[in-house]
């Protein structure tokens, strides 16, 4: 059976008090609507239509060709929004799920189960519900004497008795697609809001003797919508807790989960230890037996087995096995560290390849460079790579020793087994097995201070 999805993402989100389009506010480093799209796609849906309005181009820019789009110029209610997908879906067979773009915690597993329940019951519609202690603001599930759904009533249209009901509609539905678009044309806006409500489609189906199911989830967090910054922080916390829980169950030690942020696309090997205050974002891959020291930040990087990152920032870089970084080092985009490398305190590496066993231990900048195997770069060494217009490359061979406070003025090549004397400014290439000294000779005037 064909399966389709409609993501409702046209709301302005005025309660966010933001210039940014509501569904583009991020949870765990990713726009809310992108979380929803990934869960929808993961549930086995063949085609997705996202309903956009204010800020449409921004949403399209994030989701790209993973979705089709329909534009809702005026926000006249959820039924009106769904009807905007008519040109894409009206004649399709199969099941269509409707999901709100501001529910970033919904999982593909719950959507899969909702669809399966709906199709197994041969229902025309199924609503995902949950029971919560404080149902204010949600539509209530009103059941008849036999426990079947009678209707869904919105908060502003509910009687006091209905407001006392704690089973709520999540705003997530599964429909027989053709039934959905047939009934949408019959929805009226005679309610307190003057809007066209999608739950009214369920009442129309019931009035015609159709089957409407309720599938209740026990995970209330999943259906939480985000309407303001407080709810955004709650969703962030819930996503953080879920992600950390997953990694801990898979063999990762997280010393303080409450202060540790790990993005949803991060992979971490077993027996790795994450210390407090760490942030790991993007498509980062961390191997086994790694230690990520407190307050480190890692983005879109690869950290291989046995490496140790201490209080450092790593962006778009790779760190080899058993390599030590930090404390207080910065690996910028293009930094590639081999195995058994040491990058020490207050060292900055940018677009540089440090081969196995290389050491840059203190107070150095290495940019646009290649440092050979087992070469030692002394404290305060700088690759002078920029002339104000262009960047130039520095190459240092293997088994070389660069003394403290050396300037390597690129473009320049230092050979293998070279010794560069401390305090030198190197402007010319140095061949293998050489000593390079480029500094003024010391002059001492004895008795000068007497």
Curated annotation (Swiss-Prot):
UniProt pathway annotation: Nucleotide-sugar biosynthesis; UDP-N-acetyl-alpha-D-glucosamine biosynthesis; N-acetyl-alpha-D-glucosamine 1-phosphate from alpha-D-glucosamine 6-phosphate (route II): step 2/2; Nucleotide-sugar biosynthesis; UDP-N-acetyl-alpha-D-glucosamine biosynthesis; UDP-N-acetyl-alpha-D-glucosamine from N-acetyl-alpha-D-glucosamine 1-phosphate: step 1/1; Bacterial outer membrane biogenesis; LPS lipid A biosynthesis
Annotated coiled-coil segments of the chain: none
InterPro entries linked to this entry: Bifunctional_GlmU, GlmU-like, GlmU_C_LbH, Hexapep, Hexapep_transf_CS, NTP_transferase_dom, Nucleotide-diphossugar_trans, Trimer_LpxA-like_sf
Binding site for UDP-N-acetyl-alpha-D-glucosamine: 8-11, 22, 72, 77-78, 139, 154, 227, 332, 350, 365, 376
Binding-site residues for acetyl-CoA, renumbered to this chain: 385-386, 422, 439
Cofactor binding comment, as recorded: Binds 1 Mg(2+) ion per subunit.
Protein name per the record: Bifunctional protein GlmU
Lineage of source species: Bacteria, Bacillati, Bacillota, Bacilli, Bacillales
């Amino acid at each position: 059976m064909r399966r389709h999805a409609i993501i409702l993402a046209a709301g302005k989100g005025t309660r966010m008090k933001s210039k940014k389009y509501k569904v583009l506010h991020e949870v765990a480093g990713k726009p809310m609507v992108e979380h929803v799209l990934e869960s929808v796609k993961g549930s086995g849906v063949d085609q997705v239509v996202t309903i956009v309005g204010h800020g449409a181009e921004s949403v399209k820019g994030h989701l790209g060709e993973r979705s089709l789009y329909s534009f809702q110029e005026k926000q006249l209610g959820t039924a009106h929004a769904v009807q905007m997908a008519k040109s894409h879906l009206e004649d399709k067979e199969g099941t269509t799920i409707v999901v709100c773009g501001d529910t970033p915690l919904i999982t593909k597993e719950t959507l899969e189960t909702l669809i399966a329940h709906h199709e197994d019951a041969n229902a025309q519609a199924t609503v995902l519900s949950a029971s919560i202690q404080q149902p204010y603001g949600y539509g209530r599930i009103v059941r008849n004497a036999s426990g079947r759904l009678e209707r869904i009533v919105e908060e502003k249209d509910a009687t006091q008795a209905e407001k006392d009901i704690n089973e709520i509609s999540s705003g997530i539905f599964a429909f027989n697609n053709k039934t959905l678009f047939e009934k949408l044309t019959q929805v009226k806006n005679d309610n307190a809001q003057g809007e066209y409500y999608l739950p009214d489609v369920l009442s129309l189906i019931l009035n015609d003797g159709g089957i409407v199911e309720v599938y209740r989830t026990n995970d209330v967090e999943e259906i939480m919508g985000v309407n303001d910054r407080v709810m955004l922080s709650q969703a962030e916390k819930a996503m953080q807790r879920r992600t950390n829980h997953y990694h801990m169950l898979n063999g990762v030690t997280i010393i303080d989960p409450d202060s540790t942020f790990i993005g949803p696309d991060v992979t971490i090997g077993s027996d790795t230890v994450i210390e407090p205050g760490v942030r790991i974002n993007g498509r980062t891959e961390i191997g086994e037996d790694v230690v990520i020291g407190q307050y480190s930040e890692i983005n879109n990087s690869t950290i291989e087995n046995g490496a140790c990152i201490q209080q450092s920032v790593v962006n778009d870089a790779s760190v080899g096995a058993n390599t030590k970084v930090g404390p207080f080092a910065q690996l910028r985009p293009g930094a590639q560290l081999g195995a058994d490398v040491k990058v020490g305190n207050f060292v900055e590496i940018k677009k540089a390849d440090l081969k196995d066993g290389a050491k840059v231990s203190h107070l150095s900048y290495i940019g646009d460079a290649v440092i050979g195997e087992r070469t030692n770069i002394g404290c305060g060494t700088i690759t002078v790579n920029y002339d104000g217009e262009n960047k130039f490359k520095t190459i240092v061979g293997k088994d070389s020793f660069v003394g403290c406070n050396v300037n390597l003025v690129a473009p320049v090549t230092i050979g293998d087994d070279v010794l560069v004397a401390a305090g030198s400014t190197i402007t010319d290439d140095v061949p293998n097995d050489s000593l390079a000294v480029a500094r003024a000779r010391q002059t001492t005037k004895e008795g000068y201070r007497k």
